[in-house]
Regions:
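Acidic-residue sensor for enzyme active/binding pockets
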Residues: 4, 51
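Short aromatic/hydrophobic contact patches that present stacked aromatics
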Residues: 5-7, 40, 72-74
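Core segments of cupin and vicinal oxygen chelate
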Residues: 8-49
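Vicinal oxygen chelate
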Residues: 11-15, 68-92
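Short, charged/polar surface micro-motifs in flexible loops or helix N-caps
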Residues: 45-49, 56-59, 80-81
């Protein structure tokens, strides 16, 4: 078995997907432009995806209140200090 995707219910799926594409280099594999605004974003391999969707009727996670060890997305970086600076400047 392989992991195909991880799904997150977020308050603004469209803008979050745009941010991940622009700043993390993820690629949009599939999306819907009407509610629940589902976006499947793939890494360079194209096999692991992050699904962002917006369902106000379902319980959403309080992301700022979640401690990083409980829920996080780990990324590889060739230049971690530079990427941290760049992503923080972009609003991460």
């Amino acid at each position: 078995m392989k992991i195909e995707h991880l799904a997150l219910n977020v308050p603004d799926a469209l803008n979050m997907a745009r941010w991940y594409v622009e700043h993390l280099g993820l690629k949009v594999k599939r999306r819907t432009v009407e509610a629940p605004f589902v976006h499947f974003l793939a890494d360079d391999s194209g096999t692991v995806m992050l699904e962002l969707y917006q369902n106000p009727d379902a319980p959403a996670l309080d992301f700022p209140a979640i401690q990083p060890p409980a829920l996080h997305l780990a990324l590889l970086s060739r230049d971690l200090p530079a990427d941290v600076r760049r992503l923080v400047q972009a609003g991460a």
